[in-house]
Amino acid sequence: GSIFAFSQPYSGEKLSRGLIGIPTEDGMYFSWRMTLEDAAGLQFDLYRSSGGGAEVKLNKEPIDRTSDFLDRTVDYTVDNRWTLKATTGEVTTWTRLKGEERNPYLSVPVCKPEDGEIAGESFTYTANDCSVGDLDGDGEYEIILKWSPSNSKRPPQRGFTGNTYLDAYKMDGTRLWRIDLGPNVRSGAATTNFLVFDFDGDGCAEICCKTGDGTVDGLGHRIGDAQADWRTWDKKSPTYGKIVNGPEYLTVFEGRTGKELDSKEYIPTRYPLDGWGGVGGNCGNDNTGGRSDRFTAGVAFLDGKTPSPVMVRGWYGRTVVA
């Protein structure tokens, strides 16, 4: 079977209003989503209950021309609860407790991976790329975060890297799962491009990315040969610390759990290593993975209805799309 058998005609995300409140110098600023399903003439009212008291409507006229509102009379010294009511009967709430810092952003706690050491070099982790998607079908976005080690490398650079991790978080910081891409996926900005999209149309987004032997899914299961190590350990080799041999996989993970749903051979392959030269970049070439290990990815509706992962290898000279 094909990994693309997961793809089904796309019916759109079924998201909640996504009501959010951010403190500003002028008051508490609220915004929310409008959806494609909203009927013409839909109106909203915003209410606030302060200190456990009765709800008070904040807007004088129905809100129907925008999807935001500024509460200029909020008292931050007491607990506040706002309720957004639509004329359809839909109700959404937002709560802010007294004493909370008035930061103009929403802070989401995350779980940093432990520091590590490889080939005598210590490394730590920093938060890197992230994406969002409704992983569990509750109508709320979750955050998918890539953790990058401090010894990440550009493709031409020799040397080892720590593993790359993908985490999934609820907006309150609850971690749903962690995927360890393992030792056979080199860490670097040019390597891991992960896609977050509801490919199979079940209302929950999946994660799709390049993996290797020893990748650990969100349930702790290993992909491919768990004992394989395809890194070059010969210090005299021009590919020292790189991965220029061994299988590469394209894997789809379940959004709810991070479980591997399916893995297939990654296309396009890296071979021939010296087949990626051309006029792009510095017009040079190499056979050490400098050009063959540069990736991008995206989602395309190739037939106008069904989402498909699109994987790209090679930035300069030769580029292959699959």
Pin down the residues of each PLM region:
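A structural signal for short hydrophobic beta-strand segments in well-ordered beta-sheet cores
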Residues: 19-21
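Bacterial N-terminal signal peptides
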Residues: 1-2
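Short beta-strand segments and strand-loop junctions that repeat across beta-rich extracellular domains
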Residues: 23-24, 45-53, 83
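N-terminal prosegments of processed precursors
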Residues: 25-26, 173
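Boundary at the C-terminal end of the N-terminal hydrophobic targeting segment
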Residues: 5-9
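Solvent-exposed loop/turn segments flanking beta-strands in beta-repeat/beta-sandwich domains
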Residues: 35-49
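Structural beta-strand segments of beta-rich domains
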Residues: 17, 26-30
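Beta-propeller-forming repeat regions
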Residues: 12-16, 34-39, 57-66, 70-322
